[in-house]
Amino acid sequence: MTSICSSKFQQQHYQLTNSNIFLLQHQHHHQTQQHQLIAPKIPLGTSQLQNMQQSQQSNVGPMLSSQKKKFNYNNMPYGEQLPSVARRNARERNRVKQVNNGFVNLRQHLPQTVVNSLSNGGRGSSKKLSKVDTLRIAVEYIRGLQDMLDDGTASSTRHIYNSADESSNDGSSYNDYNDSLDSSQQFLTGATQSAQSHSYHSASPTPSYSGSEISGGGYIKQELQEQDLKFDSFDSFSDEQPDDEELLDYISSWQEQ
């Protein structure tokens, strides 16, 4: 009985061992099939390694050369620029300079009180104005001046109209005008009379006397030795001189106007 049991046990153990071996073989066979599906890596030779190194060097070479060229270009002096580029840069610098000078002149013509009032205590009151703020304040300042001119013109026109209405109502301007005419006529009449009297005295005959003798010794004796009255003909004198005629003609023409 014991021999039979031992033989059965050995037989079962043998079967288990064979099955395990079969499974291990099957797994090994399956793994080898999977490895065969993947392409095996070809070992690299010396020629392939050299080709790879050359390709890497060729890729790195242009990068280094471009960096070197860029570095050298930055260090190039300005004299090596193209003439067209140099002229363009000079024109641009001149334009920027003119614009800056124009804004400086504009800031100088803006009163500081106007800048402080229009900037509302902002940047313009203490610091340098920007170009945008300068233009904005200049526009507001010009508008304010234009409004002042318009208001002044309108007020002066109203004042003229009001004064004309008042003078037409009270008649004072008319009286002043009459007074001025009367004074001018009186002046012209006096001038005419003086001119006529001057011409009459110039035409009248004038007597001539001889000189007197003065004797010494404390006694003064005047003797009229000769008294020759020389009369020129009245016809030889004209009533009016040429200058008087011109003056009278001018006065008469002025009165007729």
Curated annotation (Swiss-Prot):
Task: Please provide the record's keywords in A-Z order.
Answer: Developmental protein, Differentiation, DNA-binding, Neurogenesis
Q: Which domain of life is it from?
A: Eukaryota
- InterPro entries, sorted: bHLH_dom, E-box_TF_Regulators, HLH_DNA-bd_sf
Q: Which GO terms describe its cellular component?
A: RNA polymerase II transcription regulator complex; transcription regulator complex
Point out the coiled-coil segments of this chain: none
Q: Which CDD domains match?
A: bHLH_TS_dAS-C_like
- Record domain bHLH: where: 83-145
GO molecular function terms noted in the UniProt entry: DNA-binding transcription factor activity, RNA polymerase II-specific; protein heterodimerization activity; sequence-specific DNA binding
Name the tissues where it is expressed: L(1)SC, SC and AC strongly label the presumptive stomatogastric nervous system, while ASE is more prominent in the presumptive procephalic lobe.
Q: Where is the composition biased (Low complexity)?
A: 165-184, 193-213
Q: How does it assemble?
A: Efficient DNA binding requires dimerization with another bHLH protein.
Task: Look up the further comments and give them.
Answer: AS-C proteins are expressed first earlier in ectoderm and then in the internalized neuroblasts, while T8 is expressed in presumptive neural precursors, once they have segregated from the ectoderm.
Name the chain's protein. Achaete-scute complex protein T3
Record the organism: Drosophila melanogaster (Fruit fly)
Q: What is the lineage of its organism?
A: Eukaryota, Metazoa, Ecdysozoa, Arthropoda, Hexapoda
The gene for this chain is l(1)sc
